[in-house]
A protein has these predicted regions:
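N-terminal loops that bind phosphate or other acidic moieties
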Residues: 2-66, 75-142
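Conserved alpha/beta-hydrolase "nucleophile elbow" surrounding the catalytic nucleophile
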Residues: 70
Length: 142
């Protein structure tokens, strides 16, 4: 049986995708190939529709694809919407903990809607208004 490849795309307005990809690569020692799509950076750049189309054309139809987009309903997310399927998962409102968790998920574990949903729910707990949190700081941590 042929191994299914998992593809990772981080897509955003301007350079957020590049920065998040760079940080994930740094923290994971670049163990996974991650594509970054940075829209609306320069005048005269290739239209994002074309970039997305070419990217998906380079993948096998059996590949699993995880798309991390910056904003729900935004113009970047809209370019990935037509590609959504059982094998193409689009997550909006990205953050580092969510992206890391999904990139580090074993490729032996098939991506299901339930699995992706659970990671999204877990990542919501990583967004914290720290002023409202009471915790003791260990002086050894500083």
């Amino acid at each position: 049986m042929e191994k299914i490849l998992r593809r990772y795309i981080i897509a955003s307005h301007h350079k957020l995708a590049y920065g998040l990809k760079d940080t994930v690569d740094f923290l994971t020692n670049g163990i996974k190939k991650i594509y970054d799509v940075n829209a609306y950076v320069e005048d005269g750049e290739k239209p994002i529709e074309e970039v997305v189309s070419e990217l998906f054309a380079s993948f096998d139809e059996n590949d699993e694809v995880l798309v991390f987009a910056d904003m729900m309903g935004g113009s970047v997310y809209q370019k990935f919407y037509p590609y959504m399927s059982d094998k193409v998962h689009v997550v909006c409102g990205i953050n580092l903990p969510l992206t890391l968790a999904l990139v580090l998920e074993s490729e032996d574990t098939p991506l299901t809607q339930e699995l992706v949903h659970q990671y999204v729910e877990d990542s919501k707990n990583q967004i914290v208004y720290v002023n409202e949190v009471n915790f003791a700081v260990d002086e050894d941590d500083e």
